[in-house]
């Protein structure tokens, strides 16, 4: 058995903007992963979108060699993880490949709900969590208060948390020294049959599927025939290697290491994330416990603007699904928008990111319908069905009970802003479960309807608390609610893509707001366009987009009134005929207006 004591696998847990990507850059710089010229800010956030929004979306991995003060050279395999609530599954995947995690906390802001949630995930998976206080060079840093928060809120010892500043590079070497000392080396047997976990896969147009793997036992080298356990297919390995952060091929990957494998897999679903790889000569190696499949929380229809793009859209989705295990989709057709897909997302940020990636990376023009959550319906005949699309809602006479998903929201907020946050939660039909005062922060738990949370709760929470509140939520149960379907009719015709499922108490208000919003967005036609919101057969709100009309009396100078009346009647008849055959073009903004209806 070869010695694995020089390997350390770790990931970084941090809230958005607490500086984990910058810390990663310092690690790469100190260990000489890239030359000065190649060093760019946020090296690992390689997607343009990640840089623009300043967030990490995908997990990335880097292998670095660090010469410690004890004279040994350690191999550090570091997996960068996202910090946003929508991407928690990326985090759990990264953690499954590590023995330890750095909990990076901004010394000025203190602990945030997101880090708490990810930290618990790490502790549940048995990882060694090592606290690091970042941004110590800022004047508002309060290390003692933050250490106390870490101990209070998360419950891990923070007396000897390392203080550093990733931006200036101060104390980063201390972090590395401490890391080598605290985080345990991996366990594994190089001589045993190969057993490797796929952490991530993505599709490269030239190489096929590239998989990021963590080898548990055995070794894998170029030319080996590997077996994908879940599909039973065998592939020949073309190359193995590590990211330093550049692609660099190595002779082999051994137990305890993290690196990439390219095996010329052309089928997009050939190497599913969370799967186990082994050699074809030892097919009976056990599957490694993968990751639980995560259920999408929010569904929306995406339709290509021109129907010719449908096939390209399908292909783009397949490639994205490979890289993003949480994405689920099925074909859907709409009378108003033609053919497209109903796609399941983890949250609104995830939905925006995916839409932007489809439009940028695959050059598609898409229309998105309003996102909805999954409702549970109990029918009169005793069946239970789940509906994620308002247009698929059965007739109300068949429904015994409608239940909406409830989430438990865990909110951390400074005491000064507590009142505003509670007001917001009550407005969103929340029920308070628990409140704890932790130093200057308050931890509040609320049960909230998921439909209220996914739309704009996060943005509203940030604005009422001046950006200080942080949120983490998880699905708890389905609960009976008085829900109705709100249809939008344009010129008396239902537009299926604009339907919403809303709570009866808010239905009139939402209907009014929606019709007002649509009135601003639908361009004026040559005839009046009536926009109505209806619940069943009852119209609850209506607005009219007034017609454009030509002044037909311009050519009459004075003269008899009957002459003018004749011209006006003629115009009226023409408009009436036009209205019977005319169709109304609905712009993309109108579909998005449904999202922006303030609750």
Curated annotation (Swiss-Prot):
This protein's record includes keyword Cytoplasm: no
GO molecular function: GTP binding; GTPase activity; guanosine tetraphosphate binding; ribosome binding; translation elongation factor activity
Domain tr-type G: 5-187
Subcellular compartments: Cell inner membrane
Binding site for GTP: 17-22, 134-137
Keyword Metal-binding: no
Annotated keywords: Cell inner membrane, Cell membrane, GTP-binding, Hydrolase, Membrane, Nucleotide-binding, Protein biosynthesis
Any one GO biological process: positive regulation of translation
Topological category with respect to the lipid bilayer: Peripheral membrane protein
Catalytic activity: GTP + H2O = GDP + phosphate + H(+)
EC number: 3.6.5.n1
Stored InterPro entries: EF-4, EFG_III/V, EFG_V-like, EFTu-like_2, LepA_C_sf, LepA_CTD, LepA_IV, P-loop_NTPase
Pfam families assigned: EFG_C, GTP_EFTU, GTP_EFTU_D2, LepA_C
Gene Ontology CC entries for this record: plasma membrane
The protein's role, per its UniProt record: Required for accurate and efficient protein synthesis under certain stress conditions. May act as a fidelity factor of the translation reaction, by catalyzing a one-codon backward translocation of tRNAs on improperly translocated ribosomes. Back-translocation proceeds from a post-translocation (POST) complex to a pre-translocation (PRE) complex, thus giving elongation factor G a second chance to translocate the tRNAs correctly. Binds to ribosomes in a GTP-dependent manner.
Assigned protein family: Belongs to the TRAFAC class translation factor GTPase superfamily. Classic translation factor GTPase family. LepA subfamily.
Protein name: Elongation factor 4
